[in-house]
């Protein structure tokens, strides 16, 4: 309710949010607002989080499905931005290669299209997937987002509703399916993946050097603005990994908290 209050905004460099937050919270003037994007962050920083239960903003929320809670059940982080991730597609490049996004409905059809583009990369002037770099600014796409795929299907089958102590790994082969495709049907393979960055992967799609790029809706402004991509050429498909019935799958969706 008070206006005119000076606010200092600290922006962490790419891939350094966790270390930056830890350093800021250790200061006498710790942050008033900060992000806890997953349960791991709640475990690390929950003691600094003021519970939202009983506040006006909680009364305004239509669902608490995306909120994060502490061990005592208190709501410690709430969703403020709804977003989705999957495989971003340059439809114009697909068409140039003689394919259509409509023919991709599962892992088998995705692999067929990607294999064909990769085999003709020199002729086409672009490859199938942008680099799946393992440098810190890129690796979170796979250690976090991609890892959701086998976990989602396992938890769905087993009726898991809370963090389990162990996993069965029932769908780890499916994780391997899509990871192998990312790292095979790409111009960046092998040892080069260790140092390939997130910016490089983004630029490969943005500059028309790759047809597929795993990331999320937050990439729209960079791709349409920085790289001047035609919005009509952009689409996103689910991350297919060879699970039965995935033809009916949608995008992975959630919130920043």
Where does each model-flagged region fall?
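Hinge/lid segment of periplasmic solute-binding proteins
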Residues: 37-89, 145-147, 235-237, 245-247
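A local structural motif
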Residues: 3-12, 98-102, 181-196, 209, ...
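Beta->alpha turn/N-cap motifs
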Residues: 35-40, 198, 215-220, 239
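Glycine-centered hinge/linker elements that transmit conformational signals in sensory
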Residues: 114-115, 160-195
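Extracytoplasmic/periplasmic solute-binding protein
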Residues: 76-80, 85, 111-164, 210
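Short, solvent-exposed loop/beta-turn-alpha elements that line the ligand-binding surface or hinge
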Residues: 53-65, 103-105, 129, 133-136, ...
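Extracytoplasmic "Venus flytrap"/periplasmic binding protein-like
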Residues: 2-64, 92-98, 105, 203-204, ...
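Extracytoplasmic/periplasmic substrate-recognition and gating elements
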Residues: 2, 95-97, 187, 226-257
């Amino acid at each position: 309710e008070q206006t005119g209050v000076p606010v200092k905004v600290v922006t962490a460099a790419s891939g350094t949010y966790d270390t930056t937050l830890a350093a800021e919270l250790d200061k006498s003037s710790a942050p008033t607002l900060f992000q806890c994007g997953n349960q791991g962050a709640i475990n690390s920083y929950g003691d600094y989080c003021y519970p939202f239960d009983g506040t006006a903003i909680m009364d305004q929320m239509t669902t608490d499905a995306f909120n994060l809670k502490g061990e005592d059940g208190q709501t410690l982080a709430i969703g403020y931005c709804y977003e989705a991730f999957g495989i971003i597609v340059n439809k114009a490049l697909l068409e140039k290669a003689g394919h259509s996004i409509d023919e991709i409905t599962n892992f088998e059809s995705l692999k067929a299209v990607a294999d064909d583009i990769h085999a003709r990369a020199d002729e086409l002037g672009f490859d199938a997937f942008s680099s799946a770099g393992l440098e810190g600014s890129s690796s979170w796409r796979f250690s976090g987002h991609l890892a959701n795929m086998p976990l989602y299907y396992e938890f769905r089958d087993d009726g898991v509703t809370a963090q389990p102590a162990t996993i069965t790994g029932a769908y780890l082969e499916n994780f391997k399916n899509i990871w192998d495709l990312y790292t095979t049907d790409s111009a960046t393979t092998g040892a080069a993946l260790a140092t390939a960055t997130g910016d490089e992967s983004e630029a490969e799609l943005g500059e028309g050097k790759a047809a597929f790029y795993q990331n999320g809706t937050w990439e729209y402004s960079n791709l349409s603005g920085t790289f001047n991509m035609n919005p009509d050429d952009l689409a996103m498909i689910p991350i297919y990994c060879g699970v039965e019935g995935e033809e009916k799958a949608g995008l992975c969706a959630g919130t920043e908290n």
